[in-house]
């Protein structure tokens, strides 16, 4: 420690070094981005393919399977799922965390190219991919409303103008629009009028397509001039299409308006969107992978004036939902907790030292260490988030520890009559190794966490590095700045001054004397203390097994997502009514601020809702409590269910589910899967540990199955392709022509009039023109009957899959839910052909359970190795680590007391305790070893004196750590559910360990000393016997 004497003799250099650390930290702080949590986004790529009119089974076998075979060969794919519905397939690829998404995207494109020859030739476009997780909640939702413009026109503005501009902004990954579709000219045909005129639907289609043509025409020129040729070959509005002649009947022209209603409408009339019960278009913005939420939202907010200016004055563009306010509020709460923690720690130091000068010395270590850490955070690419700021809050109790130990030892020498400069040199020489051991062993706790793969390792890497850097800076400050300031600020006092025996110090002295008397008794009854230590180890095991567990604390982000699931045969009109009813019920809750939702598209029995709650200061209930009371009201709506779940910052997997947790059934036999899924789902629904149980298996959709009489068709001169074309023209909203405009392209959509789509009897009015040109009714050669058919087909890997989703009732933990599911699956006797496994967050939870004990054990072994190297001993590290069982018991009991489940955040608290509580033992053992090796004291006298002399710094460091964590326990604002488990664990562990380790550590020290003496005497006896 002679090196550090240089800093005592060179105060200017020491001060400038300290200032440099602080200035670098200030600069780093200004450059740090802000986010709710560290970047832990799994690389997810969504591949989409379409084949209009194809059934879900056709899409699954002809499109999804070839794509899955090609995509499944890509390296680093951790999960591959697909959903095939009417005319569309989506394949979701989730990659390992260490996979670069850009490299993965190149592999995905290559796989799509390789599968192209295996896909149906009728696909109008190649499959496309997006680097975005479709299951992620939008970071911002905008709404467009107007009293003058139609929904289709609003959608056009959103798609043509807003979407393009927003997509170009930094951080934006995907912009999706819901609530309607692009404008279109819709041709609603009257099949009876067509039959009377002898005109087929296909003839109408061809006439429209031939009347609207865009193709190169060329130019004419002479020696002086050139003219381009332009014609009126394009029709752009409904009024232009209506007078179109499509047929001549006995010389009389039959116009389109004679057999159809032509109007300007939308491409897909089966879409609806609403914002607070008012028709609206929803613009849902998702961030790009690894993009910062706050930066992305700020970019969009800054562009809002420009976006509004680009729209007509009659259109209102509003922000319906924004993720950033609760993030900012949560970070403000953490910053407030940090300031309170710093103040409390300094107060603790002042109470013990009773001197402004003496208090200022360790107090300087706190801001310098914390501020200097910001520089390292910036260099490591970290952000200011809940976890990194929690690390700094906890660090306030640690960074002062080393300075306290150095200051207390120097003060003891000054009170003994030594001059301040000499006391500083002697004091730092005596405890330099102690503070080095304390700091290095604390940092060593995080080495296994830094090496840990997967989500927990990535999630808490910033926490571990941030805290470790703060501790190492504090170590540097305590060995440089602290002794230098002690040599110049502390006054030489020949003996303890009278004021130190007053007030708080009198209480402390009485406690120390009482501790000395009780310690003598304990050392004389060491056997009982050892039994107590063994009892705490056993209690640790029992508490860990029995305590409720979860993966990550459920956050209250002020936002809810709702998923509507209605009867599979419901019509679009009825589904729109359900959406309105649900929005009315949700809006009536006093904690709800606004509600937005949409329905329609390829699956008319589903819908989505986005709910913003009032700020936490304006409501007296949590998001989960809002869901619980709404669940009762929503259950009264017949024929449909609305499943609500709070939006979380961590979303695992890419599966779009109606609830927060999933259990997936897999089978190579689709019929077996469809047989067992309802039974399993029904059994899950009866479990009290689960709520909102639902499934993505949609195999009960209403379908009208037509059976062709092929012999009759052959006699009548009718082909199957002609009949299929008839049905597609009549009921498929077929896009038959394209209208080209400067900013976009629009479609001409043809189908029969709505009056003929309301009932199955309309099929009797359909006819086909045979090879002789005669109209033949469909009923002449076809029969039909209603059957059940799937609305979607799901795969995971290459197996048929069905995912059962569920939420947790209020007060239920995830470990109880997963255990109940496993018991139920065992009792049902599910055949081996059907396999079950947890997915998403539930799967990550189960995987983390198997690694938690290994992580704790690895941390203990790492600390043991570091201490063994520092002390050159196998035994003394065990003495120091004997403090851990009591801390574990205190932490687990505190979690039980507060009703908090054991989560990843609590696990980090346990690991922190491994580093914290051993500090007390290090201070005792280090002093005892020095005294014992000097030969002046026996082992018992050495450890007894060490306990008494180190009582004050032990109390100071423990209370500093305790008060540093206390604001996390008492916090109640935004993000409190994330911070409290860490604070509860640390405070509980510190309180219990402080009570027990003051007695168990000296007993264990003497126990190992006696064992060592016995081993030494054994060889001596062997020699004498020989």
Curated annotation (Swiss-Prot):
Gene Ontology molecular function terms on file: xenobiotic transmembrane transporter activity
Key words of the record: Cell inner membrane, Cell membrane, Membrane, Transmembrane, Transmembrane helix, Transport
Pfam (any one): ACR_tran
Keyword Transmembrane helix tagged: yes
Lineage top rank: taxon: Bacteria
UniProt subcellular location: Cell inner membrane
A cellular component term, taken from the record's GO annotations: plasma membrane
Family: Belongs to the resistance-nodulation-cell division (RND) (TC 2.A.6) family. MdtC subfamily.
Protein name: Multidrug resistance protein MdtC
Gene this protein is translated from: mdtC
